[in-house]
Each structure stands twice: as structure tokens, then as C-alpha cells.
Regions:
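Bacterial N-terminal signal peptides
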Residues: 8-19
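N-terminal cap/lid segment of alpha/beta-hydrolase-fold proteins
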Residues: 21-33
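Conserved HGGG/HGGXW glycine-rich cap/lid loop of the alpha/beta-hydrolase fold
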Residues: 32, 38-87
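Active-site loop/oxyanion-hole signature of alpha/beta-hydrolase fold enzymes
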Residues: 73-120, 269
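Flexible "cap/lid" loop of the alpha/beta hydrolase fold
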Residues: 126-130, 136-175
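Conserved alpha/beta-hydrolase catalytic His-Asp/Glu region
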Residues: 151-163, 173-233
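Conserved serine/cysteine hydrolase catalytic core
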Residues: 209-260, 265-268
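Catalytic active-site module of serine/aspartate enzymes centered on a nucleophile-bearing elbow/loop
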Residues: 262-295
Length: 295
């Protein structure tokens, strides 16, 4: 039966194998094939979700950390329009990304899942929670983004102001179309704690795999999303871990303690702390995983 299911779904097309790391593809539908990487073979699957314009490559240190694991499978994928996944014309909202994620989970027959979204990847995983609930979820990890994208002031844990009076959202929505290379370079540099030319180039090359129109639409539609109620509803029910950049500690900590007080929160580095500080990040991850074993 498993072989038949495999053939019917055309689930896995092996494209690369290095050690225990495999890079594969899943055909979601006629317009979308998702590229993903995975290591390990445990009963629990940790799914790392890249942020805006990013790809599986950013989680290289987490995949290396779980390589050969017998307890955890670590998986990361390129959302539609990003990295090596298909570039369809339609569907570039985080609500649709969540539906793509649900199809990916079904195709790979995954259960006992820990979602670990980063940046707009948090929005994607909360959109999944909103649409599909927690039946297949074991825990959630939010990496440097809260559940609401906009707020009235910078005292809130958000990316943008409701009226965009500082032009920050416009800079990404319109700017990525009008001045693509400038936005990519500046955004790549901002994400890094130690933005050497080599690092900025590496991150920028990943971003260039996403078209300007797709990036603009994702940012524009993400502006309106608020999944605070969905996340707060899991307080005391689903284990939650927040790993947030150091400069946001005061604002993020206030929201976390007020709304999900049983959650674990760790603060370090800048936006790409998991890549620049892999030992500290993976240590925090391991501590969280140990704390929820048996739950």
C-alpha cells in the first residue's frame, strides 16, 4: 500500500544526496512543485519555514545539527515562488502558503510536527494553525516574528505601522519593484549581526531567486494579517518557543508574558541568529525539545 500511495502521489523525486541530507521535490498540483531538504528519521518532524524571499539554504546549520538523528526528522522547504520551488503566477499569499504546507504534510504523511517559522514564515505557520488546527502539531517555534504584522506604535511587537507613516512597508512593497537590488542588499545587510560583504552577497543571492512581483505581493498581503487570537488560544495547550533578536526583547517579552505566559522565550543576535549563532540557537532548540519530550 505504501508503494502504491507513493506512485499515485508522485511524492518524491530525488535530486541530491549528500551524506544523510537529501534534497527532494513534491508535486503539490499541476502548477506547484515544492523543493525541500530533510535529515534524520525520528517520529517527530521539525519543519523550518523560511521567511520573505528566503530558501532552505538559510537553515543549513539546523539540518547539520539533526543529521543522523534517530529522534527527529528536520525538514525545510522553499515556499511557492521562492528558492527552487515552482514560480506560479497565482497564490502568493501566506494563507495559500499555509494550504501548500498542509498539502506537503499530507503528501509526506507527516504527524507529530513541530512548526518552526522564521520571519514571515511565522505568519505562514499561524495561517496553517488558523486553517487546519493542531491535530498534527506537537509544538510551535516562532523565530523573530509575532502574530500581528501591523500596530499603532513601535511599542507593539509588529513589523509595520497601521498607517505606514514611516513608509517602511511601502519600502518593501513598492521598493522591491522599483529598486530591487538596493532593497535586497539593504535588507540582507539589516538581517545580519555581522554583515560582512561575503555574508551579504550570500543572503542577497538567495533573495534574487524570488521575483520582485511575488515578493511585493507577499509583503502587501501579509500587511493585513493578525493571528494573535489563534496563537493566544494555544496558551497552556501547545508548547511554544519564541527565539527573538536581542533588540526586540523588551517589546516581545511584554507581549509574550501578557498573552502566552507559559511559553519559553530566548533572545539573541539579529534576525538571522539561527545562521550566525548556530550553537546558541541549536542549544536553545535542544533545551526546548528536551522539555517537551513525552508530552
Amino acid at each position: 500500500m505504501k508503494k502504491i500511495k507513493f506512485l499515485i502521489n508522485i511524492v518524491v523525486i530525488l535530486t541530491l544526496s549528500i551524506g544523510n541530507l537529501t534534497a527532494e521535490e513534491v508535486k503539490i498540483d499541476e502548477t506547484l512543485t515544492i523543493h525541500y531538504k530533510q535529515v534524520g528519521e525520528g517520529d517527530t518532524t521539525i519543519i523550518f519555514i523560511p521567511g520573505w524571499m528566503m530558501s532552505t539554504d538559510v537553515f543549513e546549520h539546523q539540518l547539520a545539527h539533526f543529521e543522523g538523528s534517530k529522534k527527529y526528522r528536520a525538514l525545510t522547504y522553499d515556499p511557492r515562488g521562492q528558492g527552487k520551488s515552482s514560480k506560479p503566477v497565482e497564490g502568493h499569499t501566506y494563507q495559500q502558503h499555509a494550504r501548500d504546507l498542509a498539502r506537503l504534510i499530507d503528501k509526506l504523511d507527516l504527524e507529530n510536527i513541530i512548526l518552526a517559522g522564521w520571519s514571515y514564515g511565522v505568519t505562514e505557520q499561524l495561517a496553517y494553525l488558523n486553517q487546519f488546527g493542531t491535530d498534527k502539531l506537537k509544538a510551535m517555534i516562532m523565530i523573530d516574528t509575532g502574530p500581528d504584522i501591523t500596530g499603532a506604535t513601535r511599542d507593539e511587537w509588529v513589523w509595520y505601522l497601521n498607517d505606514d507613516s514611516d513608509g517602511y512597508s511601502r519600502g518593501f512593497t513598492e521598493g522591491i519593484i522599483e529598486n530591487r537590488e538596493k532593497v535586497i542588499a539593504e535588507f540582507s545587510e539589516w538581517m545580519l549581526e555581522n554583515p560582512t560583504p561575503e555574508k551579504v552577497t550570500w543572503v542577497s543571492n538567495i533573495a534574487r531567486q524570488t521575483s520582485s512581483s511575488v515578493a511585493s505581493i507577499n509583503n502587501a498581503t501579509g500587511f493585513y494579517l493578525d493571528y494573535s487570537r489563534d496563537l493566544i488560544s494555544q496558551e497552556g495547550k501547545l508548547p511554544l518557543l519564541y527565539i527573538v533578536r536581542q533588540e526586540m526583547k523588551e517589546v516581545a517579552d511584554r507581549w509574550i508574558k501578557a498573552n502566552t505566559p507559559s511559553a519559553t522565550a530566548v533572545y539573541m543576535g539579529k534576525h538571522m541568529m539561527f545562521w550566525e549563532r548556530p550553537k546558541a540557537f541549536n542549544h536553545a532548540l535542544d533545551n526546548f525539545l528536551s522539555s517537551i519530550e513525552g508530552k
